[in-house]
């Protein structure tokens, strides 16, 4: 079960371009565990999860909902992970690499100076 949870966490972050919530990790891990149990093959469980991730709207669409701006709650601004996705697709036409994900996780992409770096 630990390897399934590790796969869900790692693959899910790459597929969704953001960290998964605890609820998402629990749901996807349960689906993988059930598929592995039903087929008696852990690889079938991982295949079911990969298929579920690749069919999710979070993978298929680039969502930019944003979060309330702390200085002006009537406005919204991109979250750090949304900014990482926006930059990566603009510059490389691909998902964020490890450096952009790390910058998003540290909060560096929430400032103009961090985006320019």
Annotated model-derived regions:
Residues 1-117:
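Composition-driven recognition of low-complexity segments enriched
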């Amino acid at each position: 079960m630990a390897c399934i949870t590790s796969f869900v966490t790692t693959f899910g972050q790459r597929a969704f371009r953001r960290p998964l919530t605890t609820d998402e990790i629990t749901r996807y891990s349960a689906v993988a565990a059930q598929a592995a149990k039903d087929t008696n093959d852990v690889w079938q469980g991982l295949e079911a999860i990969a298929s579920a991730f690749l069919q999710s709207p979070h993978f298929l669409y680039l969502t930019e909902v944003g979060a309330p701006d702390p200085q002006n709650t009537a406005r919204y601004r991109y979250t750090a992970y949304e900014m990482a996705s926006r930059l990566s697709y603009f510059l490389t036409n691909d998902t964020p690499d490890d450096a952009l994900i790390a910058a998003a996780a540290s909060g560096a992409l929430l400032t103009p100076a961090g985006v320019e770096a």
